[in-house]
Regions:
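An acidic intrinsically disordered interaction segment
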Residues: 63-72, 107-125, 163-181, 217-235, ...
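Mature N-terminal, pre-catalytic/accessory segment of carbohydrate-active enzymes
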Residues: 1-66
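Long, well-ordered core segments of solenoidal/helical folds
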Residues: 61, 68-80, 121-138, 173-195, ...
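Extended polysaccharide-engagement surfaces of secreted carbohydrate-active enzymes
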Residues: 256-651
Length: 651
C-alpha cells in the first residue's frame, strides 16, 4: 500500500495539536462552571453579589468604595494612554501597558455599581484603545508576557461585568482580541515557546496565566478554546501550589511577593467560585501573611517609599497592596492579624492602588483585627532561610533581618532540576540588614545587579557567591551544586536573640570555603555583635563587608562612627584586630538599568585560612552615644559586655 508522506506529516501535526489541547481539557467539567454558561456577570460578581455590594458600599465598605470611586473618576478624566513603543525604561516589555489593564476593572466596577453611563463609556474607551495597541510587548515578547497578562485580565472583567451595556460591536472587538492574544499566549505556554512556561515559582507565570484564565472564564460557552484557557492555568497553578515551601516566605522579595500573591489570589478565588477547587493547600498560604508582617518596617517609620525590608529585587515601598492581599488572606484563613495589618497600611496611606477594587470583594467586616503584640518578636522562616528579629511591636522598635538559605528554599531545591524562577534572588547568604530609631543603619543594595560585594557578607579573593555576576541571579549554578547554606539556630529571649548560620555551601568549591559560620547576638535594644568563624582549605584574601545606611563616617580610635540624617549614631567596631586591616570608603557598585550605586563600605581584610572575627554594632538616637562593646577571650570562648550585660559564644 502506498502512503502519502505529506498526509502523514499533516496527521502527525494534528495529533500533536490534539494532545496539547487534551492535556488541558476540563475533564470532568466542573458543575459550577457549567452552571454559568450563557450568563453574565460570573467573574467574582453575580447578580446577587451586585445587590449585596450596592448595600455594603453605603455601610461597612463605604470608605473602601470611596477609594475605588475616586480612582475610577480619575481614570475617566485622564483617558487611556496613547500607544508608545518605548517608555524609556522597560524595553521590549512595554510595561506601561500594565496600568491599562489595571485601570479597566475600576471603570467596569464603577459602571456596574453606580449605573452611571460615564463609567461605562470610559471603560469601553479604555478597552478599545487597549485592543487597538499594535503590540503588547515588542518582538518575541509581543503578546507573551506581563503587559498581555494584565490587559487580558482587565479586558475579561469588562467583557463579563459590562456584557449587556457594551453592545455587540464592542463585544465582537473584544472577542477578536481574545482570540488573537489569549490564543497566542495559550499556544506559547502549552508548547514551551514562552520562556516562563515552567517558571512555577516566578511572578511572570502567575500573572500571565491568571490573565489567560480570566478570559477563559469570561468566554466559556462562547468560544470552544475557552475551556483550555482555563485548564492550562489550573494545571500550572496546581504545580505551583505543590512547589511552594512551608514557611510562607518568598525568594523574590516582598515587592514581587505582593505582585505574585495578587495574581495567584485572583485565580484561586475564581477557581473556588467557578471550578469548585480549593487551591489553598499546604503550609505556605496560611503562613504567608506573616511573611509580610515580619518583613515590614516598624510602622511609625512607614512612608510611601520606605516601609519594607528590601531583600532580593525589592523596593522599600509597596508595588501591589498589600492591604487587598492581606484582606483576602484574612478572609480565607480567619486571620485577625492580617486584617489588622491591612487596616494599618490603609491608615498610613502607604498602599499601592493597582487593584484596590479587590477590597470590596475580599474584606470581611465581621473579622476582628488583632494587633501583633502577642506575637514572638523573632520569626524564623525555615524553608527560605530568613530570620526577622525585633525588639518589640511598639512601632518604634529596632529590627534586624538575616538571610542564609538556598536560593529558592530548601524544599524547592530538592524538587527541581532546573531553575523554576530564581532570577530576582541575590547572592547574599549570611547577609543582614538593620533598622533602628526610624532609619536604616545597615542596608541592602536593593533592586540591583547580582553581586555579593554589595551585601554584608564575605568575599574570597574578591569573589562572591555562586549565582553572582549578572543582572539576574544565575540559579542554575547553585542548583547544580545543590548548595544549601542554612540557618543552624534562631532563638529569642526578652533581652537577647541568637542566630547562627553556615554559608559555606554558597561559595564555589574552588573558593575552598569549608566553614563560614556567622553568629549574631542581638543584645536588645541597641547592640548587635557579629562573630564570623571562617575556615578555608588554604590561605586566601578574605574580606568582610558591611554597608551602613549613612553614606559617610569617621574613624574614632578603632571604631567607625556614622550619623544618619535624623541624628542617630551608629558605631561599628572591629573587636578582633590581630592581623586585620580595616577600611572605610565609597564603593561604586553596579546598580539597576546600568546606573552606578554608591555604597559606603566598612571592610575588614585578612589573608588567612582560619579567621575568627568579631564586629560590634551599637547605636543611639540623637543626643545620646552608643554603648561601646568590650571583648574578652577565655580559651575558645568569647565574651562581650554591653553596659551591665555580658553575653558570649562557646564552642
Amino acid at each position: 500500500m502506498d502512503i502519502n508522506a505529506r498526509l502523514d506529516d499533516v496527521a502527525l501535526t494534528r495529533i500533536q495539536a490534539a494532545d496539547m489541547f487534551a492535556e488541558f481539557a476540563l475533564n470532568p467539567l466542573p458543575a459550577a462552571l457549567a452552571s454559568v454558561q450563557g450568563t453574565h456577570p460570573r467573574l467574582y460578581l453575580t447578580p446577587d453579589r451586585i445587590r449585596e455590594l450596592r448595600q455594603t458600599i453605603t455601610s461597612t465598605h463605604a470608605e473602601l468604595w470611596r477609594e475605588v470611586l475616586t480612582l475610577a473618576e480619575n481614570a475617566v478624566r485622564r483617558g487611556p494612554p496613547a500607544y508608545r513603543e518605548d517608555d524609556g525604561w522597560s524595553g521590549e516589555e512595554q510595561l506601561w501597558q500594565r496600568e491599562v489593564g489595571n485601570t479597566i476593572p475600576y471603570l467596569a466596577l464603577a459602571s456596574v455599581l453606580t449605573e452611571d453611563p460615564r463609567f461605562l463609556n470610559a471603560a469601553r474607551e479604555w478597552a478599545l484603545v487597549s485592543c487597538a495597541y499594535p503590540t503588547w510587548g515588542l518582538g518575541r515578547i509581543d503578546g507573551m508576557d506581563l503587559s498581555t497578562g494584565h490587559q487580558l485580565f482587565g479586558l475579561a472583567l469588562i467583557y463579563d461585568w459590562c456584557y449587556d451595556g457594551l453592545g455587540e460591536e464592542t463585544r465582537q472587538r473584544l472577542r477578536e482580541t481574545f482570540e488573537l492574544r489569549a490564543g497566542a499566549m495559550f499556544r506559547a505556554a502549552a508548547s514551551g515557546t514562552a520562556w516562563w512556561g515552567k517558571s512555577y515559582l516566578q511572578n511572570h507565570l502567575w500573572v500571565n496565566v491568571c490573565g489567560l484564565s480570566a478570559v477563559g472564564f469570561a468566554l466559556y460557552g462562547e468560544l470552544d478554546q475557552a475551556e483550555f484557557w482555563i485548564g492550562l492555568p489550573l494545571v500550572k497553578f496546581r504545580t505551583t501550589m505543590e512547589a511552594l515551601g512551608s514557611d510562607g516566605a518568598s525568594h523574590e522579595g516582598i515587592g514581587y511577593w505582593q505582585y505574585g500573591v495578587e495574581y495567584m489570589l485572583k485565580f484561586m478565588m475564581l477557581a473556588r467560585q467557578l471550578l469548585g477547587e480549593d487551591l489553598f493547600v499546604g503550609e505556605w498560604w496560611p503562613n504567608t501573611a506573616g511573611y509580610c508582617q515580619y518583613l515590614m518596617l516598624p510602622r511609625h517609620a512607614w512612608s510611601r517609599t520606605n516601609c519594607n525590608v528590601d531583600l532580593a529585587d525589592c523596593p522599600r515601598g509597596n508595588w501591589y497592596g498589600p492591604d487587598t492581599l492581606l484582606r483576602g488572606l484574612a478572609t480565607v484563613f480567619t486571620d485577625g492579624r492580617a486584617q489588622w495589618l491591612a487596616e494599618q497600611v490603609d491608615s498610613a496611606g502607604i498602599d499601592a492602588p493597582g487593584a484596590k477594587w479587590l477590597n470590596l470583594f475580599w474584606y470581611d467586616p465581621t473579622l476582628t483585627p488583632m494587633p501583633p503584640t502577642d506575637l514572638p518578636t523573632l520569626r524564623h522562616f525555615s524553608d527560605m532561610g530568613i530570620v526577622s528579629a525585633r525588639t518589640d511591636w511598639s512601632g518604634d522598635e529596632a529590627l534586624m533581618v538575616f538571610k542564609c538559605g538556598p536560593f529558592i528554599g530548601h524544599d524547592a531545591l530538592q524538587v527541581f532540576d532546573y531553575d523554576p524562577g530564581g532570577g530576582h534572588v541575590h547572592p547574599d547568604a549570611n547577609h543582614f540588614v538593620l533598622f533602628a530609631d526610624g532609619e536604616w543603619l545597615i542596608r541592602d543594595d536593593g533592586y540591583c545587579a547580582k553581586w555579593t560585594a554589595q551585601h554584608n557578607t564575605l568575599l574570597v579573593d574578591g569573589q562572591g557567591q555562586m549565582g553572582e555576576g549578572a543582572q539576574w541571579f544565575r540559579g542554575s549554578i547553585p542548583l547544580s551544586a545543590k548548595a544549601r547554606p542554612r540557618i543552624l539556630r534562631a532563638e529569642s529571649t526578652d533581652d537577647l536573640d541568637i542566630i547562627v548560620a553556615d554559608a559555606a555551601e554558597a561559595y564555589a568549591k574552588k573558593a575552598g570555603v569549608e566553614r563560614f559560620t556567622r553568629h549574631l547576638l542581638f543584645v536588645k535594644p541597641a547592640a548587635l555583635i557579629v562573630v564570623d568563624d571562617i575556615v578555608l582549605k588554604a590561605p586566601r584574601d578574605l574580606e568582610l563587608r558591611f554597608h551602613p545606611g549613612p553614606q559617610e563616617g569617621e574613624e574614632q580610635g578603632a571604631a567607625f562612627i556614622c550619623r544618619t540624617e535624623k541624628g542617630t549614631t551608629l558605631r561599628i567596631e572591629p573587636l578582633t584586630r590581630d592581623g586585620v586591616s580595616t577600611s572605610a570608603t565609597i564603593v561604586v557598585a553596579q546598580g539597576n538599568h546600568g546606573n552606578d550605586l554608591h555604597l559606603y563600605t566598612v571592610a575588614m581584610h585578612k589573608k588567612t585560612a582560619t579567621w575568627r572575627n568579631a564586629t560590634a554594632f551599637s547605636w543611639a538616637p540623637d543626643g545620646e552615644q552608643p554603648q561601646p562593646v568590650t571583648f574578652a577571650e577565655d580559651g575558645a570562648s568569647m565574651h562581650f559586655t554591653v553596659g551591665d550585660r555580658t553575653v558570649g559564644i562557646t564552642p
